[in-house]
Amino acid sequence: IGPAGENLALMAAVMNDKHRAAARSGVGAVMGSKNLKAVVAQGKKNPTLADTEGMRKLSVTISKEVGVDVKKGSSLREYGTAYVPQVTNTLGILPTRNFQTGTFEGTDQIDGVALKEKYLIRHTPCYRCPISCGRLTAVDDEEYAGKGEGPEYESIASLGSACGVDHLGALTKANYWCNELGMDTISTGMTIAAAMEMYEKGYIPEEDIGQPLRFGDADAMIEMIQKMAYRDGFGDSLAEGSYRLAAKYGHPEIAVTARKQEFPGYDPRGSQGMGLLYATSNKGASHMEGDLAYSEVFGVPEKIDPLTSEGKAPLVARFEDAFALIDAAGLCVFLAVRYVFDEDVNLWPTRLTQLMNLTTGAEYTPAEIMQAAERIYNLERLFLIGAGSGKNDDTLPYRMLHEPLPDGPGKGKVVELDKMLPEFYADRGWDQDGVP
């Protein structure tokens, strides 16, 4: 962990491989609270496999299957996740100025094309990955000079459009700082965005902050990141996250959170399934608990209408179970979703079952694997309920339920959570109070 974790900032991440982050839910602060700086694993032995030759053959098959998609022309390969701002902006769901709108006029200046033209050094793939979505970048602008990885889409949305910042060099520098300090870029950027809105509306006095904090002020944003990590001055309030910050100043409606965690980069008013996902995610607002954007936004395996709430409950449950399995197996989402949403619905459990059996020597069936996914999600849910977070927290912030989107294809829409939530409980076999 970095200084943010040491100072128990609630958006502190656990960093690994220099630029990779276990970022959400304040896990860095948990380590910091235990005076645990790092966990180190050392060893020279290779992992043992139950069937080495079988695994080799299956790996070749999987590489070819994934490679077919890559060869067709993958934006993920060419631009990394930085290609996504253009997609979400077109759909009107790009978080802009703390989710006050869903379109950002500066998108062209901070997207993957701009990043590739200005700052890209090379791709940084994980070992033998055919997708190669990682990016090593360097900013040569004197004011924001630096070198590192990223920014990824979520960082662009939270540190860029959500804060009204359209300077790619400043945004990239902010991303570097978050990595150096050990911070979740999503909660960091979204918390600053909430503070910017409250400052502009006169809810936070300038003397509390020590300086102006307006949307679009990249230098102020970067300074706030450093203050958050060290709990310096106003940074002490920011380090508590937007939910507590907004409550402190008497305007809880400004915070855009679920289970007190800041939203990622998809405005659910224009992506209804994402709204249900945020409300029911076991770790608070998260796109990594079952990203329905794959279908609503990217059309995988087929495009579904993001503006309707009809039929979204069973889809969200399916996505949540699939992502639980991906995490449990230690797989990359970008590789795994190629199977989760294949036209052949049996391909996903079949491939994962093969991987599990060749690794462990077990004889799982696809049905058993899928049942395990449901058990994982239900067990997490029971843990939450035991901690006092059940149906009462299966909700969304005021803005999502009562303030219609002002622009984009979803103009006039709010999240229809009251329609989707009972259907979701029923689909999962939970009672009307959301208890498995």
Where does each model-flagged region fall?
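Extended C-terminal regions of large enzymes
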Residues: G2-S25, M31-P436
